[in-house]
Amino acid sequence: IIGGGPKKRDRLGLYSTPPDCVQALLTAIDWRGDTIMEPCGGKGAIIDALRPTHRVGYSCDIDPQADGIERRDFLTLDSSMGCTAIITNPPFALFERFVRHAFSLGVTRQAYLLKVNTFSAAKRTGLFYEHKSFARLDLTWRPDFLGLGSPTMDCTWIVFDGVCAPICEYNLLERPE
């Protein structure tokens, strides 16, 4: 990786989400009317950022070392667990499966923290064209997932909202103070 050197990957793609990433999303979109699911709960970073002001309905993770949440693969859920929205930082390789599964559960409000180039792969363009009611909210800083002080990955929130008009909104999110 240019600028950062190769990094050892977590076997399940688990990287704690810095709270400023979640705060920026919460500033851009109002989620207070939703009951939120976090299907990649990991160490609870997103849940911790949500809890003071938002309803968290359910959190799970496939990782047996996940803290204080149900150990379960989101892709095996057969109900929305009473949740109306998803906010998560999924393993990038599973993003499309997560989106499709969430829609199959009836969860139409979804936010995923992803690499900026997520839709650069031709195999993912189908998802874009099927669900154009979404926003792309690019972070104006590079999140430090590893806590090493020299992050190299540009990130964006991809937000699906089944009640929006069939358009794609693009915006920038400033880093919260």
Question: Which sequence ranges carry the predicted segments?
Answer:
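Class I S-adenosyl-L-methionine-dependent methyltransferase catalytic core
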Residues: 1-177
